[in-house]
Amino acid sequence: MTSPLHATGGGAHPHAALTGTYLDGAHLDEGVANLRPDYRALLIVAIGVRGGPSDAASDEALTRAEALAKARLNGAPPESLPEIAAWRDAFLGFAVKPRQARSSLEALLRRVDAGLPRIDRLTDLYNAISIEHLIPLGGENLDRYVGPPRLVRAHGDETFETVADGIPT
């Protein structure tokens, strides 16, 4: 994993130090890298982005993404797309059966016909980007993040919190 670029236009970006605190310790575990040497991670820190409930702009982005996905699929299942087939192959490398754990992209594509849920502005936007570019994409609230981001191979006994409507489940 490479370090983020902290400069633009020849001068230091005003948020470079803050961005560095989030990304400098980012780590892709050797166990993941060995299973998928072709895997690349891209981490982006967005500072000053306003969250909040879904709005007209995020709804429009998802509506465009839904239309694009329907046109690409043309009635075929998501796994017919080469990008989805590649992610299924990656999951098999992690000893995960594709029907038991799908990439977030495949899960979104499977929901397109019924309409994608509108969750909140940021989630709606990264879901739209995921569909438009056919890449699994996610987001985290870095104000609540503990430690640097890391991607490790799960053992299966990990605990994690899930949240629905802002309430831990």
Each language-model region and where it sits:
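Charge-biased, low-complexity intrinsically disordered regions
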Residues: T2-T169
